Amino acid sequence: MVWYWFTARKNGKHIRERIPADSQTEAVSELEKMGYTDIVITDIVITE
């Protein structure tokens, strides 16, 4: 599994979390659909 750690804003709050996705593009797209803005991918973690 690939986890993408990100920083973003949602409802005026600064957030740092992670999201599982197959690609960085998919991760950003999903975050945008959930209402996140100012998205920056900070780390990529691959787990088995």
Task: Please give the residue ranges for each predicted region.
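Short, mixed-charge low-complexity intrinsically disordered segments
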Residues: 33-48
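DNA-recognition helix of helix-turn-helix
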Residues: 30
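A short, exposed loop/beta-hairpin motif centered on an aromatic-Gly-Thr core
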Residues: 13-22
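Short aromatic-glycine-(Arg/Gly/Cys) micro-motifs in beta-strand/loop hairpins
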Residues: 1-14
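Residue-level signal for functionally critical sites in structured catalytic/ligand-binding pockets
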Residues: 8, 24, 46
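Residue-level signature of catalytic and energy-coupling elements of molecular machines
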Residues: 27
